[in-house]
Amino acid sequence: MAQVVVTGGAGFLGSRLARELLAAGSLEVAGSGARPLRRVTLIDQAPAPADLAADARVTVIRGDLGELLDAGRAGPDALAGADVIFHLAAAVSGECEADFDLGLRANLRATESLLASCRALGTNPVVVYSSSVAVFGGSPEHPLPAAVDDQTLPNPQTSYGTQKFIGEQLLADYTRKGFLRGRAIRLMTVSVRPGRPNAAASGFLSGIIREPLAGQRAICPVGPETEVALASPAKAIGGLLCAATASDEAWGGRTAVNLPALTMTVAGMAAALERVAGPEVSALIDWVPDPAVARMFATWPGRVRSDRAAGLGLTPDPDFDSVITMHLAESRP
């Protein structure tokens, strides 16, 4: 029997991951063969979606992750019996730039507490860490290469990217010491996200599609020529699941794996929206430059090579038209 913990389990990716696990009913843990799914524990400050909370296989724990994993409180008990822990809980990029201390608490100290609790379990669980393409960055001293790859040295230019890179290194060291089996996967910007906008600096890359499809205007704060590295929600979930199921030999080392990316210009995204939904919909995008957002995006890579992920069988989305079509299909009542 397999037991899974998802931090950030009430969020968009966390809840989608939980639904896929429950629908499958089994999970192959690190290449050891499929096991029936016994329990999925969702940890989040927000309430879990009603459908997940109603599932008898789901346990919901509400609260701040760092506090819940404090040794003087629940400590490792919150993770007891877990074979796989998906660590998705995080403060997003815009939040971390606006509130430095929030980023430290949510992305660094909570991760430290989680890893310490996994060590205390003494069971060598698989820990899938949701990192980000934001660990890469360009600066005058160290400009970005034409495309980053799995061996490119991270040079984060945001607090969020720095915190994610530190998390990768901590996970690798806990793995080296034999306390757990860490699998860090760098997610690309996920688009199209449904629901309400979040505080991520990259949130507009969903908003310029989602809002016009709902008949609402949306602001694009960067120039149409800006290149971005994207992954659909389905591809992001596929990458997370692959990180949990791959054998140690197939995973191939302690360093992070870049998720495959679909490289698009923002103008190309708008053109795809026009092809799928019509010019009257794409006309709802307002191009209003925001220098602060543009500066941040100028430090992020738009082109990503993902050789290790390709070796694991992961592929990018074929085109953005299909991503929009998928979003429309999933958004229908």
Where are these regions (language model features)?
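NAD(P)-dependent short-chain dehydrogenase/reductase
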Residues: 172-227, 233-235
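Active-site Tyr-X1-5-Lys
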Residues: 141, 155-183
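Amphipathic terminal alpha-helices
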Residues: 37, 289, 301-311, 315-333
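N-terminal Rossmann NAD(P)H-binding glycine-rich loop of SDR-like oxidoreductase domains
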Residues: 2-27
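Conserved Rossmann-fold NAD(P)-dependent oxidoreductase catalytic core, especially the SDR/UDP-sugar
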Residues: 112-157
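Glycine-rich NAD(P)-binding loop of the Rossmann-fold in SDR/ketoreductase-type enzymes
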Residues: 98, 102-113, 158, 162-163
